[in-house]
Curated annotation (Swiss-Prot):
Keywords: Ribonucleoprotein, Ribosomal protein. Part of the 50S ribosomal subunit. Contacts protein L32. GO terms for molecular function: structural constituent of ribosome. This is Large ribosomal subunit protein bL17. Pfam families: Ribosomal_L17. GO terms for cellular component: cytosolic large ribosomal subunit. The gene is rplQ. Disulfide bonds: none annotated. GO terms for biological process: translation. Belongs to the bacterial ribosomal protein bL17 family. Coiled coil: none annotated.
Length: 113
């Protein structure tokens, strides 16, 4: 699929990192990360919320195959997705925080709207 960022990692490590970030975002409501990671995480998180809005068994199984914690999938389908029933996309928001002290990478807060 064209347009995906490699984030300086092999595919398996990159997908594991993104799965963990999506799980953390859905669990806590917001995460702090770099801009490029946030853009990739945002795309995948919005797909998970759209699956939650579908609400059928197939959607739940697809979400379980991506999200790393079963309790988070339950929360996604029971609490998060119904909150966005009237919204068509745009479930997340990004705030710039500033550069990271160690390497100067631009940091953002990615949160659910």
């Amino acid at each position: 699929m064209a347009g995906h960022r490699k984030l300086g990692r092999p595919t398996d490590q990159r997908m594991a990192m993104l799965r963990n970030q999506v799980t953390s975002l859905l669990k806590s409501g917001k995460i702090e990360t770099t801009v490029t990671r946030a853009k990739e995480t945002r795309s995948l998180a919005e797909k998970m919320i759209t699956l939650g809005k579908r609400g059928d068994l197939q959607a739940r199984r697809q979400a379980l195959s991506f999200v790393t914690e079963e309790e988070v999938v339950k929360r996604l389908f029971d609490d998060i997705a119904p909150k966005y029933a009237e919204r068509n996309g745009g479930y997340t928001r990004m705030y710039k925080v500033g550069p990271r002290r160690g390497d100067g990478a631009e940091i953002v807060i990615l949160e659910l709207v």
